[in-house]
A protein has these predicted regions:
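A glycine-rich, hydrophobic loop/mini-helix early in the fold
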Residues: 42, 72, 78
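Short, flexible loop segments at the rims of nucleotide/cofactor-binding pockets, characterized by
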Residues: 30-34, 55, 97-102
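Short glycine-rich phosphate-binding loop at a beta-alpha junction
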Residues: 50-58
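Short Gly/Thr/Asp-enriched flexible loops that form oxyanion-binding sites at enzyme active sites
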Residues: 63-73
């Protein structure tokens, strides 16, 4: 997506040799108009697919996922990075390495929100 590439070139900041900071428009301060364009692009690319849920991980993915979900008219589920008291019972879990935090998380999603028929 050219709009996103241009925004990264203009406002992204390189830290060291392996980190691209996009916190001024993507994951700390969020440019909702940019997110809307990204959501439209997801809809265009997946227009021929049945999408009934969007799954992301907390925290940076939530904003874009919510805007994209408006174009697909579906709910968003986000994987949590830690167990909480209000998630009990059957859950999906896997390990995910966070490049920016330099650690591994055991992420979880309640099975009641993500089933075998979801796309």
């Amino acid at each position: 997506m050219e709009l996103l590439k241009e925004r990264i070139r203009r406002d992204g900041k390189v830290k060291g040799t392996d980190v691209l900071k996009v916190d001024s428009f993507l994951n700390h301060q969020m440019d909702v108009e940019l997110f809307a364009e990204i959501g439209k692009e997801f809809k265009r690319r997946f227009a021929d697919r049945e999408v009934n849920k969007i799954l992301t991980i907390e925290a940076s993915g939530i904003g874009i996922a919510c805007v994209a979900a408006e174009y697909f008219h579906c709910p968003v589920i986000f994987a949590k990075k830690s167990q909480t008291k209000n998630i009990a019972g059957d859950v999906y879990t896997t390990k995910v390495e966070s490049f920016t935090h330099g650690r591994v998380y055991d992420i979880i999603v309640a099975k009641e929100f993500l089933g075998p028929g979801d796309k």
